[in-house]
A protein has these predicted regions:
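A short acidic-Thr-Gly-centered motif at the start of a beta-strand
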Residues: 1, 161-184, 341-342
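Positively charged, low-complexity nucleic-acid-binding target-recognition regions
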Residues: 3, 287, 291-437
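Short glycine-rich phosphate-binding loop at a beta-alpha junction
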Residues: 261, 266-272, 312
């Protein structure tokens, strides 16, 4: 069983938008009421109140206007405060005490799974709204066949409404062909967003840089207006829409690239980059934030779990760029302006990012072989390039699973192929007698 969610934009009219705004207001009121009530009881020296007690007290003093919104959204808002308070006391350094929600805070409310209904692939029936609301894109087939957990309606910074459908489904469907089981190492960078060990790359569109002048202009215009005036709000609305476009453009690019990588490879290796530390370099901070390294890692993690791909991480201090993939020699210095890696030991000339991606994949394979078979013999026998070449020749169709070349495998089928691949790779490594270094 896999738990996931789908976020879809709602196409609403002014009447529906007003009803959604009212539901958000009720949820915000319930959250603030729970916070104020908890503070009042604590100040009076009363015992700690539970979530159930807060809900019961809130329901006893409901007024007429509250019944115009779903009861579950207000109950969940109270529960959200209790959970936020619990997180604060468990880890006060990371989570501050929950603040009151203001009108300008992010607007959202929760809907229980039995209070809303998916009418068809492009319409959904929400509580207290007479007609079904149209969706901007169709609901996924696995969402229709799976079990709905809950719904969350929210308003984005671009003034558009979205619904997130959380659901669980049984992963028994075929996902990919047996010929799509390669190996790839990924080197993330500023000039090229993702350089693959196969020689392919994902270009960095530099979306922030392209719109920097326009965003700066909007910020200057806002600074010259009276705060919260009509003109200020109009400019801020345009500024938020442009920021939303940039965010969605970057997310769409990374979604498409990571899906293709995970679908076509059974082993993916990446560097565990310290993004926060990299951002401390003020000369590169803007360019690094434009890349979305953290988003790439998050997307690869959950998509690897979905498709049965093995995601391997290499330590952040591994010198992937300075190391020669041909002989293993490590350079003392390598400036950012050097786009080609030239090895003084073996004479290898290769693109520096491709060289780094090969080293990332080889190091990940070295670590995984050591973890599975408790020996580091592969590192003594093979150079990074030789191990990657051997592993690539062994990847593909499993010898132990009885499926023909045109049969489609499920997520569990690929996991079997990954285990079989490492067993075959270890047999080749153990039988190798020639030291390649």
């Amino acid at each position: 069983m896999i738990s996931t969610a789908q976020k879809i934009m709602l196409i609403v009219d002014s009447k529906t938008a007003s009803a959604l705004n009212q539901a958000c207001g009720c949820a915000r009121y319930a959250y603030n009421w729970a916070r104020d009530t908890w503070f009042a009881k604590k100040k009076a020296g009363q015992k700690e109140v539970t979530c159930a007690e807060l809900r019961k007290e809130f329901n006893e003093q409901k007024t007429d206007w509250m019944y115009e919104s779903s009861k579950g959204s207000m109950d969940q808002a109270i529960k959200n405060f209790v959970l936020a308070k619990k997180r604060h006391y468990e880890n006060p350094e990371l989570f501050g005490f929950p603040k009151r929600k203001k009108y300008k805070s992010k607007r959202s409310f929760y809907i229980e799974n039995d209070k809303a209904r998916i009418v068809d692939t492009t319409h959904i029936k929400l509580p207290l709204i007479k007609l079904p609301v149209r969706l901007a894109e169709p609901v996924r087939p696995e969402c229709l066949s799976g079990k709905i957990n809950n719904f969350v309606v929210s308003k984005g910074s671009n003034d558009r409404w979205y619904i997130s459908i959380s659901y669980t489904y049984d992963d028994t469907t075929s996902l990919y062909g047996t010929d799509e089981n390669g190996l790839v190492g990924i080197d993330m960078g500023v000039k090229t967003l993702m350089q693959l060990s196969t020689g392919e790359c994902v270009a960095n569109e530099h979306i922030n840089k392209r719109h920097y002048k326009r965003l700066s202009r909007y910020q200057r215009m806002m600074s010259r207006r009276t705060y919260n005036s009509t003109h200020y709000k109009d400019i801020k609305k345009t500024f938020d829409k442009k920021n939303s476009y940039i965010k969605n453009f970057r997310k769409d690019l990374i979604h498409k690239a990571t899906t293709e990588i995970v679908k076509h490879n059974m082993v993916v290796a990446i560097e565990d980059l310290n993004v926060k530390g990299m951002m401390s370099n003020h000369k590169l901070a803007s360019a690094i934030s434009d890349c979305g390294f953290g988003m790439i890692r998050r997307f690869l993690e959950y998509k690897s779990a979905k498709y049965g791909t093995l995601l391997l991480k290499v330590g952040r201090f591994f010198q992937s760029s300075k190391k020669c993939s041909g002989c293993g020699h490590v350079k003392e210095k390598l400036s950012l302006s050097e786009r080609e890696y030239i090895c003084e030991e073996c004479g290898l000339v290769i693109d520096r990012d491709t060289n780094a991606a090969i080293n990332v994949l080889a190091e990940a394979l070295f670590i995984e072989l050591n973890k599975r078979f408790d020996t580091d013999v592969a590192r003594r026998k093979f150079t990074p390039a030789d191990l990657v070449a051997l592993a690539t020749s062994l990847s593909g169709r499993s010898e132990t699973t009885e499926v023909d070349a045109h049969c489609l495998l499920t997520r569990d089928g690929r996991a079997v192929m990954v285990d079989d691949f490492f067993n075959r790779l270890w047999n080749q490594v153990a039988n190798a007698t020639i030291n390649c270094i």
